[in-house]
Amino acid sequence: MASQLNRPLLSVSNLLLLVATIFLAILLWQLRGLLVTLMIAVVLAAAIAPIVNIAERWRFPRWLAVIGVYLTLVAGLTGVGLLVGPTLIAQIETLVRILPLYIDNLFGLVEQFALKLGITESEIEQFFDLQALTGWIIRSGQQLLVSSYDITTGILGGIFNLILAFLLSGYMVAGRENLISGLVNLFPQPWSDRLAEQVEPIARRMGGYIQGRVLVSAILSVAITIGLGILGLSEFALALGAIAGFTNLIPFLGPILGVIPALVVAISQGGWTFLWVLLLFIVVQNLETYVLDPLLVGSSVQVHPLYQLLAVLGGTQVLGILGAVIVPPWIAGASVLLENLYLRPKLLAEGKVSREPGVGSRESICSNW
């Protein structure tokens, strides 16, 4: 008993482990910009790996396939930029300049509608402070942009980090075997073999998600641009379509963010234009939800919607808009580890899934969490 009482509550080894953990956490926080770049690189690598694998099956060297894929991407993006870039930039500049006037016009219409309902101006100011609401919207948008801006150290730093992410992703895909072998060998047996088996399904799920999401957003952007042009908003159609397409990369919240600028512009053109634009977005969003997402994204993210929403909110809180885009595919990849290394063994032990191939599929496993 006396020896137990005299025993130190915190051993030297535990103290060293605690200090090392704190030091590692501080180091990771200081290197968060590099970590974000690595996160982007992994997502990009997972997205292009299937294309490289196809080229490799056609007897192309893997390094040559990686270079070919990137040259094709750069050529495509350059062509699109030269084709629509000047018009898009001009429309965005005009939209940024004139949008505050449209917002003031919108609030004026709201006040007029409230007065028709018998609500006095003093009651409007008391319960619905439009000026404070406008300020909150502007500040919230600035905070989101500043979060992403700080992480990437400004615009030039962001461009540099994006280029670095592309280069790193190319290296990851080209040297996949050596890289994976080096990482999993850091873990003792049998975990090294178990983790090596999870690399392919993780890459497939992350890559499938980002490929589908980018393709769906591109289709949505083109559809909205064409629709707004037909409805008489050709002056801002390209900019509003690009905004809607980019924000659509963000699950759940993105479609809502994308429709707001278009509706603000539309209502200044009249009530009928507003209704037609609203109908356009409703049709396009339903087409995405019931046709494009099941067809192109499918079940690549087999995670409960609540967890996906929390991933978006958490990513936005830490990394701004950038986090809302890159965190969900990481959650999708992490779900593979959770399913295969914890949920499936647990359900097998409980007899709820079968060991036979094809029985106890991922869908049935995912439905348990």
Where are these regions (language model features)?
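Anchoring transmembrane alpha helix of integral membrane proteins
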Residues: M1-P86, A90, S169, A332-V353
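Juxtamembrane membrane-interface segments in integral membrane proteins
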Residues: Q4, V12, I51-W58, L64, ...
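Alpha-helical transmembrane segments and their immediate interhelical loop/hinge regions
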Residues: S13, I151-I267, G271-L279
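Alpha-helical transmembrane segments of multipass membrane proteins
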Residues: I22-L27, V74, T78, L168-S169, ...
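Membrane-water interface of transmembrane alpha-helices in multipass transporters/channels
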Residues: R32-I40, N161, L231-A242, Q269-W276, ...
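Membrane-interface starts of transmembrane alpha-helices
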Residues: P61-V69, Q126, L130, S192-L195, ...
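Hydrophobic alpha-helical transmembrane segments of membrane transport and translocation systems
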Residues: F274-S354
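Short, C-terminally biased terminal segments at protein or domain edges
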Residues: K352-W369
